[in-house]
Amino acid sequence: MADYTTIAAQPRNEFGKGFARRLRVAGQVPGVIYGVDVEAPIHFSINRLELHAVLRAHGVNAIIELDIEGEKHLTMIKHVDQNVLTLNADHVDLLAIKRGEKVEVEVPVVLTGETAPGTTLVQDADVVLVEADVLSIPEEITFSVEGLDVDSKVLAGDLAMPANTSLVADAETVIASVNHEEVAEEAEETEGEDAEEAPAAEGEE
């Protein structure tokens, strides 16, 4: 992620649920910038469609240069509150960053390929904690499971780190494991039986 987007934002001097609601109705998302070198949190509002476009293009670790009335702030998305019904962003927290610094972030792990016949792949961890140059945060880390047989495990230490990125997570952290297909089916059946028995038990009470 060597590139970043510059987005114009407006300073925000009013607070409270009512004001935030009016901003959202107007297509804006309230947010705040914080960081070690930020003396006081900087409150702003940003166009929702522009924010969503950045999230779609660069993911949850997106870098944004925020232009607030001509003053530019290089930031990284730290947290986005989503509306549970519309899935629109309701609020965004941005971390002030500097070019050249390193940050710890969780990066999605994408497994590719097919394991050996008669096996099933269980992904135990969807993300892995790494340290990366703030302007070179990988959008994802891929690992091929092609041909892996039963009892094979993919550990965090097995993942190839992109340039300017190092592993922070314990190298022994299990990312994925390969099981017999029958074991996976039995586990699913057990879960289904437990789900059926729970309502029956409640009815007996």
Swiss-Prot record:
Record keywords: Ribonucleoprotein, Ribosomal protein, RNA-binding, rRNA-binding
One biological process term from GO is: translation
Q: How does it assemble?
A: Part of the 50S ribosomal subunit; part of the 5S rRNA/L5/L18/L25 subcomplex. Contacts the 5S rRNA. Binds to the 5S rRNA independently of L5 and L18.
NCBIfam families from the xrefs?
Answer: bL25_bact_ctc, PRK05618.2-1
- Explain the purpose of this protein: This is one of the proteins that binds to the 5S RNA in the ribosome where it forms part of the central protuberance.
**GO molecular function annotation:** 5S rRNA binding; structural constituent of ribosome
Please state which protein family the record places this protein in: Belongs to the bacterial ribosomal protein bL25 family. CTC subfamily.
Q: Where is the chain membrane-spanning?
A: none
Top-level taxon of the source organism: Bacteria
Name used for this protein in its record: Large ribosomal subunit protein bL25
rRNA-binding: is it a keyword of this entry?
A: yes
Per the record, what is one GO cellular component? cytosolic large ribosomal subunit
PANTHER family noted in UniProt: RIBOSOMAL PROTEIN L25/GLN-TRNA SYNTHETASE, ANTI-CODON-BINDING DOMAIN-CONTAINING PROTEIN (PTHR33284), RIBOSOMAL PROTEIN L25_GLN-TRNA SYNTHETASE, ANTI-CODON-BINDING DOMAIN-CONTAINING PROTEIN (PTHR33284:SF1)
